[in-house]
Amino acid sequence: WSLTPERFEQYLKTAFDCWHQDAMRGKKRYHRYFDNLLLMLNGQPPEACGMLGTCGMQYVVEADGSVYPCDFYMLDQYKLGNLNTDTLAQIDARRKEIGFIEQSCAVDEKCKICKWYQLCRGGCRRDRDYYQDGIGRNYYCAAYERFFEYAWPKLGEVYEEVIRG
């Protein structure tokens, strides 16, 4: 990993502070992660797939027609087929066969009892996949925990500001 959890935490806090300050001045800027947290606070699903808690059904198509289940999994072992030679039904059958989405539903036991799980939801599969044998806790778990502790009160302030709009 080139980005350590400590550096990621530092980035989250620094970017959040800038985002929060702008929002409190009435000049809220869009930041995908933070704005998705606002959606979640408002009872809506996040639009970012890495914040859903499970992988969604999507396909990435390369120029040569190769199809993969995610842009982070464009590896031979996850290749679902090729649009030049396979039907969509065959490609979808392969997705089901490898269980790509189903595997992403696995939740670590520690995650189930974490007070931030409803915001974190385990994060993107790619950050859980290679960290442990199989899909376990997110590599950046500690960074997210400390970020949520830090940002939670201010996130509520931005939420109230946006709702009053």
Which residues fall in each region the model found?
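Radical SAM enzyme [4Fe-4S]-AdoMet core and its adjacent flexible, acidic
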Residues: 1-54, 60-63, 74-83, 136
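Generic hydrophobic-segment detector
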Residues: 54-55, 113
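Flexible mid-to-C-terminal extensions adjoining Fe-S/redox cofactors in radical SAM and related proteins
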Residues: 74-165
